[in-house]
């Protein structure tokens, strides 16, 4: 999950100087600086590069803006224009993401991992066609009604996700995470085509060329279908949201699969004892298998840094 953000004063100082969010992500020195802020504050075990999953639609030529209290707003998209993209053209538009990784790797403790990431095909498809967050008034049938166009678009998205991931690895990312943030919007009939198979193809392609790079998948909202996702996609690590069934995971998912996350970020906004209790719940539930403690989503903007610090202490104490 993104570690840097509005809950940190030092982040706000840098954010105010940036023209817009995409420019911020493409200012490699600023992106690197905010990537390292949570590491300096909390001494976390890994850093995740400060960027955004919508860098890919931006790199393909679609306008991407972020409106206050609304989230991302994307411009119109043209399949013919998307098809004109090649690797060189795409990389030239987003090259500063890779510069940020190189810059961060030099400054980051060698013992700490640097995580690169991308959105999964389905999630990027949703943003490209819906042109905004699908939280409200999302119509699945409308999005996928033009099967031929959707299939063509998915192929393009997949191709450039791989290009983007490979370039991050070449630049110094030693772990990759795929965010399928809107996997939960799919019904059972469409899961295989739009979620399982595209993620499987990307994971397989990365592992074939970079077998030592761990891959984390975050299929948010799958819940009952999370076992099938793991069986088909075969990620090294499964990242879970706060509604995931931990008993189902322990029972049905191989103990070789690392589990990450789970804690609802809202616990960081409330009582320390309640947060501590819930954190220990996950740590105890997954103590007999490889587990990376993390949140089930990004840090809320209203979180106090002291709450994060306390949570880190709770986890460290449990580990020892």
Regions from the PLM with identified roles:
Residues 12-25, 79-90, 231:
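Short, basic, glycine/proline-bearing loop/turn elements
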Residues 1-59, 66, 201, 284, ...:
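N-terminal basic, low-complexity leaders that serve as flexible interaction/assembly modules and, when applicable
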């Amino acid at each position: 999950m993104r570690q840097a953000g509005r809950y940190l004063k030092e982040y706000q100082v840098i954010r105010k100087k940036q023209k817009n969010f995409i420019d911020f992500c493409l200012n490699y020195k600023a992106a690197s600086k905010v990537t390292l802020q949570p590491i300096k504050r909390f001494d976390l075990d890994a850093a995740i590069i400060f960027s955004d999953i919508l860098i890919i639609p931006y790199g393909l030529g679609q306008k991407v803006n972020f409106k206050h209290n609304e989230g991302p707003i994307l411009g119109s998209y043209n399949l013919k224009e998307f098809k004109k993209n090649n690797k060189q053209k795409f990389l030239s538009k987003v090259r500063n993401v890779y510069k940020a990784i190189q810059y961060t790797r030099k400054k980051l403790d060698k013992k700490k991992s640097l995580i690169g990431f991308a959105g999964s095909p389905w999630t990027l498809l949703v943003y490209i066609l819906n042109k905004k967050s699908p939280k409200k008034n999302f119509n699945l049938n409308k999005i996928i009604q033009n099967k031929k166009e959707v299939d063509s678009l998915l192929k393009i998205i997949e191709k450039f996700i791989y290009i983007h991931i490979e370039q991050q690895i070449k630049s110094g990312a030693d772990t990759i995470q795929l965010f399928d943030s809107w996997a939960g919007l799919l019904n059972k009939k469409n899961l295989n085509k739009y979620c399982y198979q595209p993620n499987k193809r990307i994971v397989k392609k990365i592992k074939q060329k970079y077998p030592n790079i761990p891959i984390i998948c975050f299929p948010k909202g799958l819940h009952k279908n999370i076992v099938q996702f793991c069986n088909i996609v075969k990620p090294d690590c499964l990242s879970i949201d706060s509604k995931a069934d931990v008993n189902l995971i322990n029972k049905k998912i191989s103990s070789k699969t690392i589990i990450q996350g789970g804690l609802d970020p809202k616990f960081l906004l409330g009582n320390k004892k309640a947060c501590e209790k819930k954190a220990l719940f996950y740590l105890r539930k997954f103590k007999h298998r490889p587990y990376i403690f993390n949140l089930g989503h990004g840090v809320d903007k209203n979180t106090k840094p002291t709450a994060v610090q306390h949570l880190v202490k709770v986890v460290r104490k449990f580990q020892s």
